[in-house]
């Protein structure tokens, strides 16, 4: 992706996948916008195929425990854990995005809606995921700073 100039977009994809707990991202699950005349790749396609995000198979409130059994059984397909992947992909832009997403709440729809308990549980999971990513990033940043200071 770096050769195509899409490194930032790929990083953003993995960070967003972590926040929404997308269990179905894999090497064949993203796309490109291609110029039909030249067949040149112009950009990454907007993110799509999130039907395995937001814990779709969790049926009971107990399954929404952060890092619990559901997470072990329905984790990411790339890597073992969303958090380290997201931390490795953080940039100033994605870090700011996560900070701005703190406190996110779903907008309820009058006709198409999930039960209130589920929406609240999903909001909590997303908040916990954001906090875990940012906390791990803070630890990682401190470790890097300490290592650099040790060399001086």
Cite the ranges covered by each PLM segment.
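Anionic ligand-binding catalytic core segments
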Residues: 1-22, 26-27, 31-152
